[in-house]
Amino acid sequence: MVPQGWSLAWVSVLYVSVIPSLHIINNENSVFIGTHSETELRHWLIFVKMAQRSGTAWWRMASVPINAYFERDIAFLFNPRCVIETALGSKILCRYNKNIGVVFVDNDTTCNVSFPSGVQLQLLNQSVMESIRTKTYVVDYARKTTERGDCFISVAFCRKERRRFLPRYERFVYYCISVYLFAVAVFCSCWFALDPLFNMWA
């Protein structure tokens, strides 16, 4: 007779080991997720560091129009910590930490950046920009450094390639695998949970 707690442990091991691996595969193939409008050039591209393995950093990207209500649209990522003022006078509140970088996309290379004391930016380094250039965006960018020299805003002219998400058939395969594993887990869990009852009737 199988102990009743065994099935729960088996299901837990399955989900901890197998299901996250599917998400990791999915992240590696669709690490840059976002949109860029052909008619609306003023966007914030937010790069969120997802994972790092073998010295390679993977970043997830979201895109928000600059005239959108910033805190409402991406409140789950940011708390206001600094103010970025564009050349047209728009002020955007944003937050920086070691896992988040911000690229200002505009056809105007002038902007003013101000920070409260103690706030330090995580710079988007050359390798990240090269990754953007080769994998997702065709980017020509310029750097604007503040007078204090502690940060820069990358001003980019971007053309979004059509490779945004996993191909439909790959997403279907991952979906089928997930459903199959879930069904197996439920079946085995029910089987081992009812095993003592079957033995009692026997």
From Swiss-Prot:
GO terms for cellular component: host cell membrane; membrane. Keywords: Host membrane, Membrane, Transmembrane, Transmembrane helix. It is found in: Host membrane. This is Protein U22. The keyword Transferase does not apply. It is a multi-pass membrane protein. The chain crosses the membrane at residues 5-25, 172-192. The gene is U22. Coiled coil: none annotated. Signal peptide: none annotated. The keyword Membrane applies. It comes from the Viruses.
